Amino acid sequence: MSDKIGLFTGSFDPITNGHLDLIERASGLFDKLYVGVFTNPKKAGLLTGLERKAILEKLFVGMENIEVVLSENELVVDVAKRYGVTHLVRGLRNATDLEYESSFDFYNRQLAPGLETIYLIAKPELKFVSSSQVRELLYFKQDIGPYVPEIVSEEIRKNEEK
């Protein structure tokens, strides 16, 4: 039987405890899980793609079946093809997320027939955590500690001091 290979993607700008939970749960479902840090060169983020990739790599040290990859300006299905991915993994917090993800699923099926998508439901205590909300809290100089891994808070503080 061939390996089950998953791909969980995001901008992770910044990575949240919700992302972390989904990645950890997804890693148990696959022989190999790629975590794709996607960047858009036209957008300025809190942290660079390389910084976000480095944070994720630190968070998953010792989890042998997780590999973090960086992708700039390409489609998820192209990354999936490159790594032999059998399943995309997406997190759902609510019905709005399902509607949003369904539209991508439609096109992904057209571009990569046979590539399946698995949806993981966010834990109730994490369903309101989002990178957008964390960025807004940062804008208003509020504590983001409850919503992100400690290393994320540290990296953002370092960047603010520059």
Swiss-Prot record:
Site feature location: Transition state stabilizer: H19
GO CC terms in record: cytoplasm
Residue positions binding substrate: S11, K43, V76, R90
CDD domains given in the database record: PPAT
Pathway: Cofactor biosynthesis; coenzyme A biosynthesis; CoA from (R)-pantothenate: step 4/5
Molecular functions per Gene Ontology: ATP binding; pantetheine-phosphate adenylyltransferase activity
One of the Pfam families matching this protein, by short name: CTP_transf_like
The protein's required cofactors: Mg(2+)
Regions that span the bilayer: none
Binding-site positions, ATP: S11, F12, H19, G91, L92, R93, E101, L126, K127, F128, V129, S130, S131, S132
Location within or outside the cell: Cytoplasm
Enzyme Commission no: 2.7.7.3
InterPro entries per record: Cyt_trans-like, PPAT, Rossmann-like_a/b/a_fold
Coiled-coil intervals, chain numbering: none
Keyword annotations from UniProtKB, A to Z: ATP-binding, Coenzyme A biosynthesis, Cytoplasm, Magnesium, Nucleotide-binding, Nucleotidyltransferase, Transferase
Tree of life domain: Bacteria
Reactions mediated catalytically: (R)-4'-phosphopantetheine + ATP + H(+) = 3'-dephospho-CoA + diphosphate
Gene Ontology terms: biological process: coenzyme A biosynthetic process
Quaternary structure annotation from Swiss-Prot or TrEMBL: Homohexamer.
Recorded family membership: Belongs to the bacterial CoaD family.
Described purpose of this protein according to its UniProt entry: Reversibly transfers an adenylyl group from ATP to 4'-phosphopantetheine, yielding dephospho-CoA (dPCoA) and pyrophosphate.
Protein name (Swiss-Prot/TrEMBL): Phosphopantetheine adenylyltransferase
Highest classification ranks of the organism: Bacteria, Bacillati, Bacillota, Bacilli, Lactobacillales
